[in-house]
Structure formats: C-alpha cells, structure tokens
C-alpha cells in the first residue's frame, strides 16, 4: 500500500503543531534562567570594627557569560563607583559572589553600598546594604552581639554569688548577738560573785571582831595584881602568870609580884608574830599597913 503525499504532509504538520507549545515553553524558561540576578537582601546590615578585614559579598546568578559587576557607595541620591578598591570573584556550584575587600576597615567606610551588573546593555542594580563601622576606642563601650547573648548566662552564674554576701552578713549578725548574750551572762556571774565575796568579807570581819573581843576579855581576866588580901588567897586561876604570897598575916608587910603583858591586839595582829618578844619585866611592890 502506497502512502499518499497528502497524508505525509498532514502528518508533518500534526507533529509541528504538537511540538510548538513545548518548544515555546522551553525557550521562555531558558530566557528566564539566563537573566542576571543579584541576591542582596533588602535593608541588610553589617556591624564591623575599624581595623579588622572584611569582605562584602554580592551574590550573582547568570548563565554562560559572566556579566560585568561593580560596587558603588551611596552618597545622598547618587552612587559613587569604587573602581580603585580591591575586588574578586568566588565561584560556587549554583551561584557566584562578587566580593569587595576592606583591608582593613576604616571609620570612613561607614555607609550604604550597592552592586550593579551590566548585561547586554542592561544595567541591573541590587538592593543597598549598610555597613556600621565602630571605632576601636568606642568598641569597649559598645557590647558585641556575642557579649549580649552571653549576658543571660552571666546573670545566672552571678545569682548564687549574689546570695553569698547576704549569708555572710547573716552569720556576722548571729555572731555579734551571741557575743552580746555571752557578755551579759558574764556580767551577771561577775556581779553575783562580787556580792558573795562582799558577804563573805562581812562575815569574816564580824568573826574577827568577835574573836578580838574574846581575846581581850581573856587577857584582861588573865592579867591581875595580887596583894596580901586574905580573900584573894583562893582566887588563883589555871594558867595565871602572876604569883603572890598568899595568906600572909595581917600585920606583916607583903610583897606582890606583877607581870607586864605586852601582847598586841588589833587588825595587824599578823605583824606581831614577826616581832621578837622582849623579856618579861617584874616589879615588886611592898605594901605596909
């Protein structure tokens, strides 16, 4: 069976009309994927210290030919190109990075930056990114993000230390109270001891006075003068140191002997023990009628 030319022409037209939509879609997506795109987030910020090196990246996506990309710094409404700065490319699998180098960062680098790409006579600009440069002198005054993040942990660590002075103060107050209580008890015991000593001294003084009186009475009773009175013949006592001639005749003269007692009686009786006793003196008295 022979195919007619008209049938062949109809088949070709059918395949052409069937493939046109797919070819158009592929072509459209191909154009979209090959457009240059700059991926800088809107209102992005970077905080850096003056004197440190820094790399500002501009993510660029393209197809075959790499576009010409530049950096500029915003000054009011205009953007001044930074052609004298060091730049470089960093290629990765699905995207590339156009890098602006700061070696080192200076205080006047503070501001907003923007990258732009020139592709097929078209200028594509990115969103601006801002650099906040902190001077080294004021860096110690402004805490970093790491320090701000570590502050809660620092507070948790300092909480036990905050209770330590309170504990020390409480212990010191308790110690002072105990010392005062012991001092009061010592004062009370000293006062009671003094009162007891005063009572004992008073009793001792009374006993000393009583013994002194008894000794004086005994000495007075032991000391006497004897004569020839017949009534005194029988008045001699034991331990008497006076000797007389008893029971003499009435008309005869008699001799009486008397002893002189030099004992010391008084509060300083202890001193008398160290004093040597003088020899006893006797006196003879002749009594005549």
UniProtKB/Swiss-Prot annotation:
The chain crosses the membrane at residues 158-178. The keyword Chaperone does not apply. Phosphorylated on Tyr residues by TNFRSF14 and by antigen receptors cross-linking, both inducing association with PTPN6 and PTPN11. N-glycosylated. This is B- and T-lymphocyte attenuator. Residues 31-132 form the Ig-like V-type domain. Disulfide bonds join 34-63, 58-115, 72-79. It is a single-pass type I membrane protein. It comes from the Eukaryota. GO terms for cellular component: plasma membrane. Glycans are attached at residues 75, 94, 110. Interacts with tyrosine phosphatases PTPN6/SHP-1 and PTPN11/SHP-2. Interacts with TNFRSF14/HVEM (via cysteine-rich domain 1). Residues 31-157 are extracellular. It is found in: Cell membrane. The gene is BTLA. One of its GO terms (molecular function) is signaling receptor activity. Residues 179-289 are cytoplasmic. One of its GO terms (biological process) is immune response-regulating cell surface receptor signaling pathway. Inhibitory receptor on lymphocytes that negatively regulates antigen receptor signaling via PTPN6/SHP-1 and PTPN11/SHP-2. May interact in cis (on the same cell) or in trans (on other cells) with TNFRSF14. In cis interactions, appears to play an immune regulatory role inhibiting in trans interactions in naive T cells to maintain a resting state. In trans interactions, can predominate during adaptive immune response to provide survival signals to effector T cells. Changing residue 257 to F: No change of phosphorylation implicated in interaction with PTPN6 and PTPN11. Severe reduction of phosphorylation. Residues 1-30 form the signal peptide. Keywords: Adaptive immunity, Cell membrane, Disulfide bond, Glycoprotein, Immunity, Immunoglobulin domain, Membrane, Phosphoprotein, Receptor, Signal, Transmembrane, Transmembrane helix. SUPFAM superfamilies: Immunoglobulin (SSF48726). Its main location: membrane.
């Amino acid at each position: 069976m022979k195919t007619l030319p008209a049938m062949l022409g109809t088949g070709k037209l059918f395949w052409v009309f069937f493939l046109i939509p797919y070819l158009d879609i592929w072509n459209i997506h191909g154009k979209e994927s090959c457009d240059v795109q700059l991926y800088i987030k809107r209102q992005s910020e970077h905080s850096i210290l003056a004197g440190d090196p820094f790399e500002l990246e501009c993510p660029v996506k393209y197809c075959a030919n790499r576009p010409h990309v530049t950096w500029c710094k915003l000054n009011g409404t205009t953007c001044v190109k930074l052609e004298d700065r060091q730049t470089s490319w960093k290629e990765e699998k699905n995207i590339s990075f156009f890098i602006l180098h700061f070696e080192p960062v200076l205080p006047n680098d503070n501001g907003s930056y923007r990258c732009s790409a020139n592709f097929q006579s078209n200028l594509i600009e990115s969103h601006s990114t801002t650099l906040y440069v902190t001077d080294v002198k004021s860096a110690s005054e402004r805490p970093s993000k790491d320090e701000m993040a570590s502050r809660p942990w620092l507070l948790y660590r300092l909480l036990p230390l905050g209770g330590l002075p309170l504990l020390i103060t409480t212990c010191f107050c308790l110690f002072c109270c105990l010392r005062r209580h012991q001092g009061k008890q010592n004062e009370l015991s000293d006062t009671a001891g003094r009162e007891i000593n005063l009572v004992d001294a008073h009793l001792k003084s009374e006993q000393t006075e009583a013994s002194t009186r008894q000794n004086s009475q005994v000495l007075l009773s032991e000391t006497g003068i004897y004569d020839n009175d017949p009534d005194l013949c029988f008045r001699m006592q034991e331990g008497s140191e006076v000797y007389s001639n008893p029971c003499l005749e009435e008309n005869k003269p008699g001799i009486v002997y008397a002893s002189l007692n030099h004992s010391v009686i008084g509060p300083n009786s202890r001193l008398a023990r160290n004093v040597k006793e003088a020899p006893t003196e006797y006196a003879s008295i002749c009594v005549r009628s």
